[in-house]
UniProtKB/Swiss-Prot annotation:
Places the protein is found: Cell membrane
Disulfide bonds: 104-182
Ranges annotated as spanning the membrane: 21-41, 58-78, 107-127, 150-170, 195-215, 262-282, 307-327
Family in the record: Belongs to the G-protein coupled receptor 1 family.
InterPro entries given in the database record: GPCR_Rhodpsn, GPCR_Rhodpsn_7TM, Pglndn_D_rcpt, Prostanoid_rcpt
Keywords, comma-separated and alphabetical: Cell membrane, Disulfide bond, G-protein coupled receptor, Glycoprotein, Mast cell degranulation, Membrane, Receptor, Transducer, Transmembrane, Transmembrane helix
Cytoplasmic side: 42-57, 128-149, 216-261, 328-357
Species annotation: Rattus norvegicus (Rat)
Tissues where this protein is expressed: Strongly expressed in eye and gastrointestinal tract (GIT), moderately in the brain and oviduct and weakly in the epididymis. In the eye, expressed in the epithelium of the iris and ciliary body and in photoreceptor cells of the retina. In the brain, expressed in leptomeninges, choroid plexus and spinal cord (sensory and motor neurons of the dorsal and ventral horns). In the stomach, expressed in the mucous-secreting goblet cells and the columnar epithelium. Expressed in platelets.
Designated name of the protein: Prostaglandin D2 receptor
Classification of source organism: Eukaryota, Metazoa, Chordata, Craniata, Vertebrata
Length: 357
């Protein structure tokens, strides 16, 4: 049988493989997303009666809620199949022998679907952050929570249609080593256009989304840095402008500490998101345009798939849990207060010197 992948037709989990990493990833993802949902509920996101005590949810939190639900569904649908394969020492194709290759195809579809849907929602969040900071007038007029609710369904519908193309004959799903993963086939010995074409198309779309997300985050970081510099050089004028501006960035202008929070989190998000997405994009292009020895490439493909799955684990911790007041308090006590005190001492010393002169 002329197969492109060593474990393509395997019926058992490859020896030497352990379920430890899969179990840890599932536990971390499940805990993070459940904790994120609890924090979102406590923040008043689910309130149906806006008012002084229950302000309407911001667009950002609506988008975060959609991303959290998407990641949680992905973890609950995908990870149990991996753990079941390890527990029974059977590959995905053999977990349900009567279904043939359907379970493997369903797993691969879910992997590609949730990977694309989450990336689209991450781009929407990055775009929302950039618009709110760099184009506040356009943001206030056109970006609303009601429109933000549509992001998750629209991203899901697009991802559903796109990732279902292999079922229509364009693209192919295949089982990867150690027999507990299935995903888009990224190499074909006969260089079939229908197989390689979908792999390149999927990876190209992911690359464009990653690039757009990084650009938006860098733009938002640039705006935050400019705001922070203005606050340091003109603290009184900035405070007066904040008080007179009424409703500004997300129902209230951020103070300098919040600006620093956002800057650090955006930088961390950009680095982690890029690191987790690029391995899969690289493997897809590498398999499409170079002759690959599958005996040497299976481990790299598995690592790329694992990196992709890390995004859904990291998302809730970065976007929600690290934004809570408890984390901010610890962060400010550890890093921000010494920095502010040092800057204040330097500014006071400079002022005293100028007054004596």
């Amino acid at each position: 049988m002329n197969e492109s992948y060593r474990c393509q037709a395997a019926t058992w989990v490859e020896r030497g493989s352990s379920a430890t990493m899969g179990g840890v990833a599932f536990s971390a993802g499940l805990l993070g997303n459940l904790l994120a949902l609890v924090l979102l509920a406590r923040s008043g996101l689910g309130s149906c009666r806006p008012g002084p005590l229950h302000p309407p949810p911001s667009v950002f939190y609506v988008l975060v809620c959609g991303l959290t639900v998407t990641d949680l569904l992905g973890k609950c649908l995908i990870s149990p199949m991996v753990l079941a394969a390890y527990a029974q020492n059977r590959s995905l194709k053999e977990l349900l022998p009567a279904s043939g290759n359907q379970l493997c195809e369903a797993f691969a579809f879910l992997m590609s679907f949730f990977g694309l849907a989450s990336t689209l929602q991450l781009l929407a969040m990055a775009l929302e952050c950039w618009l709110s900071l760099g184009h506040p007038f356009f943001y206030q007029r056109h970006i609303t929570a009601r429109r933000g609710v549509l992001v998750a369904p629209v991203a899901g519908a697009f991802s559903l249609a796109f990732c279902a193309l292999p079922f229509a004959g364009f693209g192919k799903f295949v089982q990867y080593c150690p027999g507990t993963w299935c995903f888009i086939q990224m190499i074909h010995k006969k260089r079939s256009f229908s197989v390689i074409g979908f792999s390149v198309l999927y990876s190209s779309l992911m690359a464009l989304l990653v690039l757009a997300t990084v650009v938006c985050n860098l733009g938002a970081m640039s705006n935050l840095y400019a705001m922070h510099r203005r606050q340091r050089h003109h603290p009184r004028r900035c405070s007066r402008d904040r008080a007179q501006s009424g409703s500004d960035y997300r129902h209230g202008s951020p103070n300098p500490l919040e600006e620093l929070d956002h800057f650090v989190l955006l930088a961390l998000t950009t680095v982690l998101f890029t690191m987790c997405s690029l391995p899969l994009i690289y493997r897809a292009y590498y398999g499409a345009f170079k002759l690959v020895d599958r005996a040497d490439g299976d481990s790299e493909d598995l690592q790329a798939l694992r990196f992709l799955s890390v995004i859904s684990i990291v998302d809730p911790w970065i976007f929600i849990i690290f934004r809570t007041s408890v984390f901010r308090m610890l962060f400010h006590k550890t890093f921000t207060r010494p920095l502010i005190y040092r800057n204040w001492c330097s500014h006071s010393w400079q002022t005293n010197m100028e007054s004596t002169l």
